[in-house]
Curated annotation (Swiss-Prot):
Entry EC no(s): 1.10.3.9
Subcellular compartments: Cellular thylakoid membrane
A biological process from GO: photosynthetic electron transport in photosystem II
Family, per entry: Belongs to the reaction center PufL/M/PsbA/D family.
Function: Photosystem II (PSII) is a light-driven water:plastoquinone oxidoreductase that uses light energy to abstract electrons from H(2)O, generating O(2) and a proton gradient subsequently used for ATP formation. It consists of a core antenna complex that captures photons, and an electron transfer chain that converts photonic excitation into a charge separation. The D1/D2 (PsbA/PsbD) reaction center heterodimer binds P680, the primary electron donor of PSII as well as several subsequent electron acceptors.
Name assigned to this protein: Photosystem II protein D1
A GO cellular component entry from the record: plasma membrane-derived thylakoid membrane
Post-translational modification: Tyr-161 forms a radical intermediate that is referred to as redox-active TyrZ, YZ or Y-Z.
Cofactor binding note from Swiss-Prot or TrEMBL: The D1/D2 heterodimer binds P680, chlorophylls that are the primary electron donor of PSII, and subsequent electron acceptors. It shares a non-heme iron and each subunit binds pheophytin, quinone, additional chlorophylls, carotenoids and lipids. D1 provides most of the ligands for the Mn4-Ca-O5 cluster of the oxygen-evolving complex (OEC). There is also a Cl(-1) ion associated with D1 and D2, which is required for oxygen evolution. The PSII complex binds additional chlorophylls, carotenoids and specific lipids.
Residue(s) at site: Stabilizes free radical intermediate: 190
Lineage, top ranks: Bacteria, Bacillati, Cyanobacteriota, Cyanophyceae, Oscillatoriophycideae
Key words of the record: Calcium, Chlorophyll, Chromophore, Electron transport, Herbicide resistance, Iron, Magnesium, Manganese, Membrane, Metal-binding, Oxidoreductase, Photosynthesis, Photosystem II, Thylakoid, Transmembrane, Transmembrane helix, Transport
Positions of chlorophyll a ChlzD1 binding: 118
Length: 360
């Protein structure tokens, strides 16, 4: 009899836990995805803060030339970063127990892998948690679909790109200047500015910002005046009412006269779908572009594509971009035996082996 009571009590505790996890009445919804999301994001955040402040230099290139990224080693908020794991580690999974000592793990950039793996798992679970909460509230699932855009972008730069390049040392450093360095090197090696998917991503991000500002200003400018209890609702709206609190017809008429009639939406659902879909699709394309360039399917090459009647090159902005990329790549490849292939495999240039005579 005692055993039966204990089993019922344990089952009751489990049921209470399940109800608490999946309850939509909590101040913050946890959900089953949250059971994984909370510890992984806490781990990633804690390790990032500690590494950003106090991590020792990391041998990122695998040539015994450590790069310091933490605040205690002379960096500031702008220049500091969690340096990616060493090129000597490559794509190997490198947890703490795989290193001979903690010093070796830190020297080879182990904290970077710890942060990005827990971070990616955490944001994946955050996406699943958005779907889970929408499902339990009877909502449509488009919130998590929109969130998949930044998730795919983070996955591209932290996971897909290092896999394609063969080493986690090619991943994006976790810092402001490190992000800029990643962008410069990416342009130098893959010519991302000439890739159509990157162009679509730029249109998505900047276009989404423009449309968001336009929409917010139009709605704010066409709000219906709030009424009191002694006034008719025909003069405005009542706080908490279910109907829209702004006049979309007025906003549509204003914008249609400002540009032209068919440049504005007179349907609220179409308008908000457009506002959501435009930046999301653009960022999806950017993530796909980074993922394809990870395997060296690079941007277009229009270098020296315009010649005059005598075969001489007429410089274009594509040539300027190419020369800038070559310069950035030379500065990036500090290792002499890893000279950029697109420079080492060019046409032979005549070299003067004897100093010319100077007739004074």
């Amino acid at each position: 009899m005692t055993t039966t009571l204990q089993q019922r009590e344990s089952a009751s505790l489990w049921e209470q836990f399940c109800q608490w996890i999946t309850s939509t009445n909590n101040r913050l919804y946890i959900g089953w995805f949250g059971v994984i999301m909370i510890p992984t994001l806490l781990t990633a955040t804690t390790c990032f803060i500690i590494a950003f402040i106090a991590a020792p230099p990391v041998d990122i290139d695998g040539i015994r030339e450590p790069v310091a990224g933490s605040l205690l080693y002379g960096n500031n908020i702008i220049s500091g970063a969690v340096v990616p794991s060493s090129n000597a580690i490559g794509l190997h999974f490198y947890p703490i127990w795989e290193a001979a000592s903690l010093d070796e793990w830190l020297y080879n950039g182990g904290p970077y892998q710890l942060v990005i793996f827990h971070f990616l798992l955490g944001v994946f679970c955050y996406l699943g948690r958005q779907w889970e909460l929408s499902f339990r509230l009877g909502m449509r699932p488009w919130i998590c679909v929109a969130y998949s855009a930044p998730v795919s972008a983070a996955t591209a730069v932290f996971l897909i790109y290092p896999i394609g390049q063969g080493s986690f040392s090619d991943g994006m450093p976790l810092g402001i200047s490190g992000t800029f360095n990643f962008m410069f090197v990416f342009q130098a090696e893959h010519n991302i500015l000439m890739h159509p998917f990157h162009m679509l991503g730029v249109a998505g991000v900047f276009g989404g910002s423009l449309f968001s500002a336009m929409h917010g200003s139009l709605v704010t400018s066409s709000l219906v005046r709030e009424t009191t209890e002694i006034e008719s609702q025909n003069y405005g709206y009542k706080f908490g009412q279910e109907e829209e609190t702004y006049n979309i017809v007025a906003a549509h008429g204003y914008f249609g006269r400002l540009i032209f009639q068919y440049a504005s939406f007179n349907n609220s659902r179409s308008l908000h779908f457009f506002l959501g879909a435009w930046p999301v699709i653009g960022i999806w394309f950017t993530a796909m572009g980074v993922s394809t360039m990870a395997f060296n399917l690079n941007g277009f090459n229009f270098n020296q594509s315009i010649l005059d009647s005598q075969g001489r090159v007429i410089g274009t902005w594509a040539d300027v971009l190419n020369r800038a990329g070559i310069g950035m790549e030379v500065m990036h490849e500090r290792n002499a035996h890893n000279f950029p292939l697109d420079l080492a495999s060019g046409e032979q240039a005549p070299v003067a082996l004897i100093a010319p005579a100077i007739n004074g």
